[in-house]
Amino acid sequence: MNKIVTIEGMMCEKCAKHAHDALSALGANVRVELNENKAYLTETTLTDEQIKLAIDQAGYTVTQIVNG
């Protein structure tokens, strides 16, 4: 399943990389777009809770997850 995750708190490219690395560590195929404050996960089996926890532990906040 594909997911679009809106992330609050990313301010720079280093922040985006940190969020990317947090999701990649869980095995996600992810692309993070700083200017959109979004992470795009493709063909993921991660639950919304797993995503939220990883982003929270990285120091950011998930404000929305859209399945699609």
Each model region followed by its residue ranges:
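Flexible metal-binding regulatory segments at protein termini and peripheral loops
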Residues: 1-68
